[in-house]
């Protein structure tokens, strides 16, 4: 029990050091904790499997910018009307019988709610999507598996990557944290980005779902550039159509239904 407690404390300490320095070496950690290189390498492998860091030659780097992470409940509460509109419009791009991938994230979860009555094969790394579609009779549901990342309710890591690389996907529907003006898409987690990139490569068509607020922002790790994405579905508040057209991405606009206000509210 004491060894297990010390091990957990070491995991926390490694992540604290990484958050401060952004990278660590096996040699430095060995000296800090007074344990063998084998032990430190096992620690780094354990943390990598859980999406906390990325192994490098002789050490590790931080997998995500924890200072910019937000709870999934907060993200789900942002721009709900826009996300619903985007999801409905994106569902019109799906043909019956297709194999589609639905990414993790609040907009992609909204997409899952709109396709419950369709006949499809759905591959996903999202717990929310799995729960949304688990009782849909026409949906053949397939999970990537992998290590669970609570911050995003998603599965990532080597197991998920291996699954994706063995599949052929007709259309993938992807979410993004960052969408820069020059058509670069990014997320807050390196290992998550690795999976996103693999999904896009495994797909005949890549569709990005992003509300207008994402435009002009950047995140920690790039997973796609304009040439990798076929279609961008966004909401009617998006006013950068010429910039997107210049990147070669097809732009699809979703009309957002006005919110009706009740008298006295």
Predicted regions and their residues:
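Conserved phosphate- and dinucleotide-binding cores of soluble alpha/beta proteins
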Residues: 2-12, 16, 20-29, 34, ...
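Generic secondary-structure boundary signal with a strong preference for alpha-helix termini
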Residues: 63, 70-71, 102, 109, ...
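Ser/Thr-centric signal marking residues that sit
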Residues: 39, 56, 99, 107-108, ...
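Short glycine/serine/threonine-rich phosphate/pyrophosphate-binding segments
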Residues: 107-111, 215-218
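HTH-adjacent hinge/linker in prokaryotic transcriptional regulators
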Residues: 2-27, 31-104, 112-116, 121, ...
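Hydrophobic alpha-helical segments
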Residues: 40, 84-88, 105, 109, ...
């Amino acid at each position: 029990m004491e060894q297990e407690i010390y091990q957990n404390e070491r995991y926390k300490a490694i992540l604290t050091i990484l958050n401060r320095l952004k990278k660590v070496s096996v040699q430095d950690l060995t000296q800090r904790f007074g344990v063998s290189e084998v032990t430190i390498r096992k620690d780094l492998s354990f943390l990598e499997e859980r999406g906390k860091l990325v192994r490098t030659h002789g050490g590790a780097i931080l997998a995500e910018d924890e200072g910019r992470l937000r709870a999934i409940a907060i993200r789900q509460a942002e721009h709900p009307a826009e996300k619903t509109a985007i999801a409905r419009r994106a569902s019109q791009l799906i043909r019956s019988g297709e194999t589609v991938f639905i990414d993790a994230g609040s907009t992609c979860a909204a997409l899952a709610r709109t396709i419950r009555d369709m006949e499809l094969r759905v591959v996903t790394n999202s717990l929310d999507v799995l729960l949304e579609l688990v009782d849909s009779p026409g949906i053949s549901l397939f999970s990537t598996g992998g290590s669970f990342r609570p911050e995003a309710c998603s599965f990532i890591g080597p197991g998920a990557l291996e699954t994706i690389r063995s599949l052929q996907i007709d259309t993938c529907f992807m979410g993004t944290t960052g969408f820069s003006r020059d058509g670069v898409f990014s997320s807050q987690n390196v290992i998550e980005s690795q999976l996103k990139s693999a999904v896009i490569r495994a797909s005949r068509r890549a569709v990005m779902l992003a509300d207008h607020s994402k435009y002009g922002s950047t995140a920690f790790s790039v997973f796609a550039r304009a040439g990798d994405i076929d279609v961008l579905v966004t909401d009617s508040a998006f006013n950068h159509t010429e910039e997107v057209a210049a990147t070669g991405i097809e732009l699809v606009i979703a009309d957002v239904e006005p919110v009706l206000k009740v008298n006295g509210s």
